[in-house]
């Protein structure tokens, strides 16, 4: 097992390194800008497979991973399971706009900190990220 080497020391300054995974470019851009306003360093990936590549390239060097559930190639749940297996200290948040996907995520309470239901406001996102990073 490898331990995620995040940047928790930055949290005093409200800055974290976040991996954002979503297959919709407009959503990625909007969420990235919103998180950067809070001072977070955000790396994006366009699907679960790309997200896992980014995570491995950084040797787990993220404080938090925020991922959509429904994506091509590898969905967010498969990504969360693989990420937690390799980087057990990684904090994971899921996002979904589908009730059935939210139900699938309920069984992952041991590895997922929270599930955001789309649509959500930027204020909701920022508050959820702040709580997750403080946990």
Regions found by a protein language model. Give the residues of each.
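Short hydrophobic/Thr-rich beta-strand motif most characteristic of the beta2 strand and flanking loop
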Residues: 39-46, 54
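Acidic catalytic/metal-coordinating carboxylates
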Residues: 46-50, 75-79
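Alpha4 helix (beta4-alpha4-beta5 surface) of REC/receiver domains from two-component response regulators
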Residues: 78, 85, 98-116, 123, ...
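Charged docking surfaces used in two-component/phosphorelay signaling
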Residues: 29-37
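Receiver (REC) domain active-site loop signature in two-component systems and cognate sites
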Residues: 71
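Active-site beta3 strand of CheY-like receiver
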Residues: 60-66
